[in-house]
Amino acid sequence: LFPIGTLYDPFIARGLDALNYACYQDARFMVVATPSGISLAPEGGAHQSISTPMIGMGQPGLTSFEPSFGDEVAAIMGWSFDHMQAKDGGSIYMRLSTKPLIQLVRDLSDADKSDIVSGGYWLREPGDDCKMVIAYCGAMAPEAIAAWEKLSEDHPGLGLLAVTSTDRLYNEWQDLE
């Protein structure tokens, strides 16, 4: 049995002592936070979560994700329950949006799911003549897709990178050095 909790994303800092202690004690849990990002909080600047991604990236024992689409959430949750049970696993911090997004209609392969939980995948693969890539995370997907559609004619080979976990991408990049 693993606890799954929800919270208002900007207020995760209020529980940092407990979060740090739980992660260092190897507690296993999933925390789901909304709303993520700076463009989503109708309450105004005092309630925007611009520093919370760093909490997810910086806390040992906690893996953070910020998916855009429902099928990404499903892939991440499937991986997360295995990760929470693994001897070398840990806890999960998932940042979600309250912004309505039109969902993609697609069947994810095992390779697609692996890319999603690894931190990112090409929503539009770059061509051989790629000189530019648009990367997005979370609720900014519609704006990034619209930008790709607008720019792809003038920029052949333009890629569109969906980042589902800055945490996992950064840590894997660090492991390469």
Which functions belong to the PLM regions below?
Residues 54-62, 151:
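A broadly tuned preference for mixed-charge, low-complexity surface segments
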Residues 2, 63-64:
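Secondary-structure boundary/capping signal
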Residues 22-25, 31, 55-58, 84-88, ...:
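Solvent-exposed alpha-helices and their adjacent loops that cap or buttress functional pockets
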Residues 26-28, 61, 155-157:
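A generic structural signal for alpha->beta connector loops
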Residues 1-55, 64, 72-78, 81-177, ...:
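Thiamine diphosphate
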